[in-house]
């Protein structure tokens, strides 16, 4: 299978840089897969699980929003946060969800509350995926 260059960058680190076969990205407008020769695009990334395929093996990385750009050079994802599932502190992630739920009680109805609910929903989907697929 043809490969292309993929960079996953967060403010803290370069989480991944190398040749890959495929990357599945959690997009705001819907998830999308990128293969070698993909048409150029720019898309917003929602909190979710990004899947990198190398040599037929899949590496799962949690991203918490960001921006993806496909160009002739490959795919670059600028993520707000990027953490490999292998490195995830599941207890801290669960506490973060509990804190988000608690903070919802303090939000006034409106746009900010809607955003907080949507973000919490994304986090819960990630948590469900981790527990339902045995990634713990």
From Swiss-Prot:
Q: Where are the transmembrane segments?
A: none
Which domain of life, per UniProt? Bacteria
Q: Which GO terms describe its molecular function?
A: ATP binding; proton-transporting ATP synthase activity, rotational mechanism
Predominant subcellular localization, coarse grouping? membrane
Give the CC-aspect GO terms: plasma membrane; proton-transporting ATP synthase complex
Per UniProt, the keywords (alphabetical) are: ATP synthesis, Cell inner membrane, Cell membrane, CF(1), Hydrogen ion transport, Ion transport, Membrane, Transport
Q: Name one Pfam family in it.
A: ATP-synt_DE_N
**Cited InterPro entries:** ATP_synth_F1_dsu/esu, ATP_synth_F1_dsu/esu_N, ATPsynth_dsu/esu_N
The free-text function statement in the UniProt record for this protein reads:
Produces ATP from ADP in the presence of a proton gradient across the membrane.
For this entry, the protein name equals ATP synthase epsilon chain
Q: Which organism is it from?
A: Afipia carboxidovorans (strain ATCC 49405 / DSM 1227 / KCTC 32145 / OM5) (Oligotropha carboxidovorans)
Lineage, please?
Bacteria, Pseudomonadati, Pseudomonadota, Alphaproteobacteria, Hyphomicrobiales
């Amino acid at each position: 299978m043809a490969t292309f260059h993929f960079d996953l960058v967060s403010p803290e680190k370069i989480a991944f840089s190398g040749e890959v076969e495929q990357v599945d990205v959690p997009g705001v407008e819907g998830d999308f897969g990128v293969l070698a020769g993909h048409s150029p695009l720019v898309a917003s990334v929602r909190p979710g699980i990004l899947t990198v395929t190398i040599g037929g093996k899949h590496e799962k990385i949690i991203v918490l929003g960001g921006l993806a750009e496909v160009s002739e050079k490959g795919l670059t994802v600028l993520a707000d946060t990027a953490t490999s599932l292998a490195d995830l502190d599941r207890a801290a992630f669960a506490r973060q969800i509990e804190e988000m739920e608690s903070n919802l009680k303090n939000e006034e109805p409106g746009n900010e509350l809607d955003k907080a609910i949507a973000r919490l929903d994304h986090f819960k989907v990630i948590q469900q995926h981790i527990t339902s697929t045995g990634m713990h």
